[in-house]
Every structure is written in structure tokens, then in C-alpha cells.
A protein has these predicted regions:
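Bacterial N-terminal signal peptides
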Residues: 2-12
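Polytopic alpha-helical membrane-helix bundles and their juxtamembrane interface segments
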Residues: 213-216, 244-245
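Glycine-rich short-loop/terminal segments
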Residues: 49-212
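Well-ordered alpha-helical scaffold segments within catalytic/enzyme domains
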Residues: 215-223, 265
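Calcium-binding acidic motifs and repeat modules
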Residues: 158, 164-165, 176, 227-230, ...
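Sec-dependent signal peptide cleavage junction
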Residues: 10-27
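N-terminal mature-domain "stem" immediately C-terminal to a signal peptide or N-terminal signal-anchor/transmembrane
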Residues: 25-66
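Active-site or metal-binding loop neighborhoods of secreted/extracellular toxin and effector enzymes
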Residues: 229-270
Length: 270
């Protein structure tokens, strides 16, 4: 129950407009502060066994000279030297490798950055992309939609320090919020109609496509109830809800129907 409430908080921006701060940034800032505490505390710690992300990070910081950044900003680690320097057991080494692998996935998915001093920061400001609205009225959406779902699931599966629900929820909210890089309503035009070739040639508006995408991608980590409740809270927040929408989580039933279609499509493929 606590997880559901936290997810609703993250998915519902404090300020609905993209130009202003939202709750997802606040959550990530809190996590970044906690990571900075781990970073600072690690100076005085002595790791005797590597059994957690915190242990692995502490060991990494102790031997910064054995870590370098690749051209894509992922971490390159000299594991042989780590074993020699710390007399690591096989289990210790596997835990360290697992931590590094998770960090590199998060870097690749643009969920975190790691600087030259190995300070981890979850990305709180996702730059907007310049999107040219398609001229064609026949489009396909499932390739990018599936790709986004896979990215979100990777962030969830690889979040470090036990933060998966908060981190993945923030990652999702930053991207689907109004004006976000996954906001198809803005990219395609709210009322512009398209024939979606890879959804049985369905005739859908940009708004309908955005709601479908939200449902499909979000379902990779969230329950249907969480997704639809969050959508309703957004409508309440901007004053576009109606008491007669109570059966659809106070969201417009047409929006909820498209969200449900996205959820159903994801469920049918997984």
C-alpha cells in the first residue's frame, strides 16, 4: 500500500506544467542527497565483505584509480587489480560486478550520471527533444512504445541502493509529463488524427496515442490501478475532472479507455 501511494505521488506532478518543478524531481533530489551521504561516509568505512550495493560503492570509491570512464560515460573497472588489492572472494567479486553492471545500464538509459570522482547522480532535468510532427497521416507507434517500456523496466530492475520504485517512477513521470520527451499528445497534436498502421490501422488522435503509450509503457512496472489513479489525479489537479467521472478514477472515461487499451496490449505481449 505504501508503495502504491508513493508511486501515485511521483506520477502526479505537483505542478502540471512542464516548465515548473514536479514531484519526481523532488524525489530524485532526495535520493541524490542520500547517495552523497553514502559517498561522504565511505571515506571512513572499511569493507570486509561485499554484500550490498553500499559495500560495492564504498569499495569502488576506495580504489578510484582502478576505475575509468569509457567514451559513453560508462564505467570501466580493472577487476583483476581489485581482487589483488582486496583479496576478494568469488562472492565479493560477483557482487561488485553486479553493482557495476547495474550502474552502466542506468548510465546507458540516461537515468544517472557518474562524474570523474565516481559520484552518482540521478538525472533530474531531462532535456526536451526537438520533434518534427509527422506530415503523414499514417504512422506506426509500437516500435518506440515497446522500446520505452523496455527502458523503463531496465531502470526499475537496475536501480541501486533499494530505490527501484522511486527511481523508476520518477524516470517515467519526467518523460510522460506535459512537454516531456515521451508526451505524444504534444508531439503529435492533441486533436490531430492518425491511422496507426501497427494497431490494426486504428484511427487515433494524438491525445489517444499519448494515453495508449502511457498505459503500455507504465504497465511494464506499475499496476493498472496505479496508472489509472495517477491519471485521474492529474485531471483533478488541473480542474478538468468531473464528479460523474468517479467510475473512471475521476479521469475522462475516453482517456481511461485508451490507457486501458495500452495496458491490455502490454499484458497480451508479456
Amino acid at each position: 500500500f505504501i508503495i502504491v501511494i508513493a508511486c501515485l505521488f511521483i506520477l502526479t506532478p505537483t505542478n502540471i506544467y512542464a516548465a515548473e518543478p514536479d514531484s519526481s524531481n523532488g524525489v530524485l533530489n532526495e535520493i541524490n542527497n542520500s547517495i552523497e551521504d553514502i559517498y561522504n561516509d565511505s571515506i571512513d568505512l572499511n569493507v570486509t565483505a561485499v554484500s550490498s550495493d553500499e559495500d560495492a560503492y564504498t569499495l569502488l570509491l576506495k580504489h578510484k584509480d582502478l576505475v575509468s570512464l569509457n567514451s559513453d560515460k560508462t564505467l570501466n573497472v580493472n577487476y583483476n587489480s581489485f581482487v589483488d588489492a582486496e583479496k576478494l572472494s568469488e562472492n565479493d567479486l560477483n557482487t561488485l560486478k553486479n553493482f557495476i553492471e547495474k550502474i552502466n545500464v542506468l548510465i546507458t538509459e540516461k537515468a544517472i550520471t557518474v562524474d570523474k570522482d565516481l559520484l552518482i547522480n540521478y538525472v533530474t532535468d531531462v532535456p526536451r527533444e526537438i520533434v518534427i510532427r509527422p506530415m503523414a497521416q499514417i504512422i506506426s507507434i509500437m516500435s518506440s512504445t515497446r522500446s520505452h517500456a523496455k527502458s523503463l523496466k531496465k531502470v526499475y530492475d537496475n536501480a541501486v541502493f533499494g530505490t527501484r520504485h522511486l527511481v523508476a517512477g520518477s524516470y517515467f513521470a519526467q518523460r510522460v509529463k506535459p512537454g516531456g520527451v515521451w508526451d505524444y499528445k504534444v508531439q503529435l497534436g492533441t486533436t490531430t488524427k492518425y491511422t496507426v498502421s501497427d494497431l490494426n490501422k486504428s484511427l487515433m488522435t494524438g491525445e489517444a496515442i499519448g494515453n495508449f503509450h502511457y498505459g503500455y509503457v507504465g504497465r511494464s512496472i506499475f499496476s493498472a490501478t496505479t496508472l489509472k489513479s495517477a491519471a485521474g489525479l492529474v485531471q483533478i489537479g488541473v480542474g478538468t475532472s468531473d464528479i460523474k467521472f468517479y467510475k473512471s478514477f475521476f479521469d475522462d472515461p475516453k482517456d481511461q479507455a485508451q490507457i486501458q487499451k495500452g495496458i491490455d496490449k502490454y499484458n497480451s505481449e508479456h
